[in-house]
UniProtKB/Swiss-Prot annotation:
Bias kind Polar residues: ranges: 451-467
Skewed-composition ranges (Low complexity): 468-486
Species of the source: Pongo abelii (Sumatran orangutan)
All copies of domain IPT/TIG, residue ranges: 341-431
Record-given protein name: Recombining binding protein suppressor of hairless
Length: 486
């Protein structure tokens, strides 16, 4: 019997993922996902003031893997407190202390007291979320998307020259209402239990779609590209539930009036009102937690204005989301799971004897391998944003097949050399060919992203594996429309 001698404190070698472990993962999908939701811009604080980020950044722990991990740790002798995930959040600089997030008993937490001072000269920054378990086992450090620092909302008539402050059709926004500028009275548009409501605790991210003025009301509607301007017809669709409000016309707010003739681009942190189209001056309004219709009053001396109440004035801001998914395929690991690689696109190169797939994304490292289903592919690391791999032959999935007879779709995942599986939500499809071409190892790739967003212009492959792009300016979107109480 051979004994393996190790020095004291030396870590055991990492376990490589087995084919069987990958099959179990693909069957059960017990992922652990960290979501960081935040605004795309943050207002700077001057002197001793603290302008807390609004809406507050929010961290969600999603996926069945968190519960399974907790149960596994408790089976291995950990107490309930030791198996509890802990998190701290900060703005990525050493001057400001990180703030603890309270995740006990729930899967989300908001960071309500983050701010950036004028002594911090950065024009952009990223939130940093440090996570570990109660027994001090490290989970890792997760970064948000990039946040732009602004001094204050632009009062000037906005132009498209400042495109990064404008709001494009099809992007996500949050809407909040603050009575008499009091922070404690802030309420956010949110969907819960199939209803729109004004929440003081959670905020929703809504797709804002630009519609043609003559688009009729319906669950299906055609959206337009371009930046949102005041006076245009828009549709707000919850990015989580798909629920939508009726057609709205977005109007600029000046003091307590809605301007009927404003047509400049909508900008970050502007106050705006939403007129319910084809109604008698009805506006989207909150009354405590309820979302209602409020009837505006015409201004007798100014026909281009309508008087609204405070509850119908909403502040608009673009939002973003960083999403990190991982799974311990060979059991617990000693190293943090971060940096979590994120794959943004796939591109098929070549054909014939060897087809190569190029992966573009972020946080790639040399210790990653690409897997097609339960088949590990030969992988070449290029840099932190690019990897190449050899597409496995179809016979690896369909024994005896020398060419593709019907479409075969396999998930694409990245696997670290210690067995950590990083799901990509992308798939590779072997597509049929008109006749036998035994030397072609891959007929084509089709990228599918499992998201609730409006699909981007998709790439399609023909039988030779080359790409044809189908692009269109309009996209059909299906939603379920909610009625607003009058």
């Amino acid at each position: 019997m051979a004994w393996i001698k190790r020095k004291f404190g030396e870590r055991p070698p990492p376990k490589r993922l087995t084919k069987e472990a990958m099959r179990n993962y693909l069957k059960e999908r017990g992922d652990q996902t960290v979501l960081i939701l935040h605004a795309k811009v943050a207002q700077k604080s001057y002197g001793n003031e603290k302008r807390f980020f609004c809406p507050p950044p929010c961290v969600y722990l999603m996926g069945s893997g968190w519960k399974k991990k907790k149960e596994q740790m408790e089976r291995d002798g950990c107490s309930e407190q030791e198996s509890q995930p802990c998190a701290f959040i900060g703005i990525g600089n050493s001057d400001q202390e990180m703030q603890q997030l309270n995740l006990e008993g729930k899967n989300y937490c908001t960071a309500k007291t983050l701010y950036i001072s004028d002594s911090d000269k950065r024009k952009h920054f990223m939130l940093s979320v440090k996570m570990f378990y109660g027994n001090s086992d490290d989970i890792g450090v997760f970064l948000s998307k990039r946040i732009k620092v602004i001094s204050k909302p632009s009062k000037k008539k906005q132009s498209l020259k400042n495109a990064d402050l404008c709001i494009a059709s099809g992007t996500k926004v949050a809407l909040f209402n603050r009575l008499r500028s009091q922070t404690v009275s802030t309420r956010y548009l949110h969907v819960e239990g199939g209803n729109f409501h004004a929440s003081s605790q959670q905020w929703g991210a809504f797709f804002i779609h630009l519609l043609d003025d003559d688009e009729s009301e319906g669950e299906e509607f055609t959206v337009r590209d371009g930046y949102i301007h005041y006076g245009q017809t828009v549709k707000l669709v919850c990015s989580v539930t798909g629920m939508a409000l009726p057609r709205l016309i977005i109007r600029k707010v000046d003091k307590q009036t809605a301007l009927l003739d404003a047509d400049d681009p909508v900008s970050q942190l502007h106050k705006c009102a939403f007129y319910l189209k084809d109604t008698e001056r009805m506006y989207l309004c909150l009354s405590q937690e309820r979302i209602i219709q409020f009837q505006a009053t015409p201004c007798p001396k100014e026909p281009n204005k309508e008087m609204i109440n405070d509850g119908a004035s909403w502040t608009i801001i673009s939002t973003d989301k960083a999403e990190y998914t991982f799974y311990e395929g060979m059991g617990p690991v000693l190293a943090p799971v971060t940096p979590v690689p994120v794959v943004e696109s796939l591109q098929l190169n070549g054909g014939g004897d060897v087809a190569m797939l190029e992966l573009t994304g972020q946080n790639f490292t040399p210790n990653l391998r690409v897997w097609f289903g339960d088949v590990e592919a030969e992988t070449m690391y290029r840099c932190g944003e690019s990897m190449l791999c050899v597409v496995p032959d179809i016979s690896a999935f369909r024994e005896g097949w020398r060419w593709v007879r019907q479409p075969v779709q396999v998930p694409v995942t990245l696997v670290r050399n210690d067995g950590i599986i990083y799901s990509t939500s992308l798939t590779f499809t072997y597509t049929p060919e008109p006749g036998p071409r035994p030397h072609c190892s891959a007929a084509g790739a089709i990228l599918r992203a499992n998201s609730s967003q409006v699909p981007p212009n998709e790439s399609n492959t023909n039988s030779e594996g080359s790409y044809t792009n189908a692009s269109t300016n309009s996209t059909s979107v299906t939603s379920s429309t909610a009625t607003v109480v009058s």
